[in-house]
Regions:
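Feature captures hydrophobic
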Residues: 1-97
Length: 97
């Protein structure tokens, strides 16, 4: 799945936290913004309540079950900036993929 395909899938399933802006920052691969304030998922950068930084490859590994999110966090492969509770709530939202 490409980043654009992922953003479209999340958008079609309303996969955001109401009233919250959460940015998935894939470094040089770009970003996906789960914008609960605007009720949409985009590939546009901007200010966020929570930013999750992870490489695109590690993200793919997590989404395909080859890498556990908590393990990635403990190994420093996944970093969270801002409101940590939003990151915790995303587990259920991202299960919609």
């Amino acid at each position: 799945m490409t980043k654009s395909e992922m953003a479209a899938a999340l958008n079609s399933k309303s996969a955001w936290l109401p009233g919250k802006r959460v940015k998935l920052d894939f470094g040089s691969e770009g970003v996906v913004m789960l914008d609960g304030a605007a009720s949409q998922v985009t590939e546009e950068d901007g200010a966020a309540d929570t930013t999750i930084k992870v490489s695109w490859q590690d993200w793919q590994d997590m989404s395909e079950g080859r890498l556990d999110g908590m393990t990635a966090f403990m190994q420093g492969k996944l970093k969270v900036e801002g409101d940590m509770s939003n990151a915790m709530q995303l587990q259920g939202v991202l299960a919609k993929l």
